[in-house]
């Protein structure tokens, strides 16, 4: 049996109940227009539906929400390996006012289970990326590198106003990253454009420092998307769009030796890739025990390359 779950001029999504359903990656692709869910098409009539019964089909979902308004598109997300429903889906109303009707109804039950509809793209103000700054994040320093080594190297590019390394209070050893502040943002631009620099025989990564209010939502969504990837069988760019609705996962998804560390960044800054910068990374010396090794097969995610200090465990040593 073939059930058509879309109407109107938009693309039609079709699920087959007696044969393997549409691959989860393809279903997800129809719902993801950007890599982080904050740009691209944000249909005001679109809703995320969580808490679905494993037996709920796209047709059942469409029939239920059809009482609130004409449904333009509807889908239930499935695991591409097992073909089982993953307990959540999406609907898009023709008239965005139908979303308010759904939200005004406090309780929703479908197939004997309470479900949780939410606005797929909630309105929120996001801090803008800082592109002009004199402060640069330096990551991947060798254990033998000193504050003086870092300062001397970057002084070859311009005057250094401030330099600091972040130290572990318990071991009194630096954690492999720090910050350099130049006397002009032009020098910082040049350093970040080169991106990788060699200090004491080890490649280090330079990124423009960003206010933590910029990095916090990015990091949270990236971390949750990375954790959920295997469970939901979706590519990261899709999960990022809906990461705020997915279950929270335990464990530390950032760099080794770092925990919840958004609270005490010096000056409220962290590192973030420069927009439009090259993503080509040269052969480097980041092994699995290094600062840049992640627990997801060694894949380096740009936003997870940001360093934050734990309020109780880390402090800085400054040259000035």
UniProtKB/Swiss-Prot annotation:
Locations of Low complexity compositional bias? 1-14
> Could you tell me in which tissues this protein is expressed?
Expressed in the gut and in AVA, AFD, RMD, RMED, RMEV, RMER and RMEL neurons (at protein level). In the tail expressed in neurons and all the ray sensilla. Expressed in male specific C1-C4 neurons.
Q: Please provide the Gene Ontology terms (biological process) for this protein.
A: nervous system process; regulation of translation
Q: Which domain of life is it from?
A: Eukaryota
What the entry lists under SUPFAM superfamilies is as follows:
RNA-binding domain, RBD
Q: What does this protein do?
A: RNA binding protein that regulates the expression of target mRNAs at the translation level. Binds RNA containing the 5'-[GA]U(1-3)AGU-3' motif located in the 3' UTR of the target mRNA. Binds to the mRNA of three Arp2/3 complex components arx-1, arx-2 and arx-3 and negatively regulates their translation during association learning. Plays a role in time-dependent memory loss and the retention of conditioned behavior over time, probably through negative regulation of the Arp2/3 actin cytoskeleton branching complex and regulation of synapse size.
Q: Which regions are flagged for Basic and acidic residues bias? A: 23-38
The RRM domain is annotated at 45-124, 134-211
Q: Which residues carry this modification: Phosphoserine?
A: 19, 34
State the protein's name: RNA-binding protein Musashi homolog 1
InterPro entries xref list: MSI_RRM2, Nucleotide-bd_a/b_plait_sf, RBD_domain_sf, RRM_dom
What family classification does the UniProt entry report for this protein?
A: Belongs to the Musashi family.
One Gene Ontology cellular component term attached to this UniProt record is: perikaryon
Region (Disordered) residue ranges read 1-48
Residues where Phosphothreonine occurs? 18
Which molecular function terms from Gene Ontology are attached?
Answer: mRNA binding
């Amino acid at each position: 049996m073939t059930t058509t779950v879309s109407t109107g001029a938009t693309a039609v999504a079709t699920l087959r109940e007696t044969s393997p359903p549409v691959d989860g990656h393809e279903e997800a692709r129809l719902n993801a227009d950007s890599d982080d869910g904050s740009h691209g098409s944000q249909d005001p009539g679109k809703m995320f539906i969580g808490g679905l019964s494993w037996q709920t089909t796209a047709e059942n979902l469409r029939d239920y929400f059809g009482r609130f308004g004409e449904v333009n598109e509807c889908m239930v997300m499935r695991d591409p390996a097992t073909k089982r429903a993953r307990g959540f889906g999406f609907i898009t109303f023709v008239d965005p006012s139908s979303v308010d009707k759904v939200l005004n109804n406090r309780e929703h039950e479908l197939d004997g289970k309470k479900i949780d509809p939410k606005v797929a793209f909630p309105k929120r103000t996001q801090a803008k990326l800082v592109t002009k700054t004199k402060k640069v994040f330096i990551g991947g320093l060798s254990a033998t590198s000193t504050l003086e080594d870092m300062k001397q190297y970057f002084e070859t590019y311009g005057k250094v106003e401030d330099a600091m390394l972040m130290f572990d209070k318990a071991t009194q050893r630096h954690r492999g990253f720090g910050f350099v502040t130049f006397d002009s943002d032009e020098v910082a631009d040049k350093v970040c454009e080169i991106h990788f620099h060699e200090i004491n025989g080890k490649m280090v990564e330079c990124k423009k420092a960003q206010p933590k209010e910029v990095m916090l939502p990015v990091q949270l969504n990236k971390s949750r998307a990375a954790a959920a990837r295997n469970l939901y069988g979706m590519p990261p760019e899709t999960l990022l769009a809906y990461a705020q609705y997915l279950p929270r996962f335990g464990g530390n998804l950032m760099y080794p030796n770092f925990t919840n560390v958004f609270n005490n960044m010096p000056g409220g800054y962290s590192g973030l890739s420069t927009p439009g910068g090259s993503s080509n990374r040269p052969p480097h010396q980041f092994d699995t025990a290094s600062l840049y090794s992640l627990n997801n097969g060694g894949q380096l995610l740009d936003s997870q390359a940001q360093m934050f200090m734990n309020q109780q465990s880390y402090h800085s040593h400054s040259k000035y």
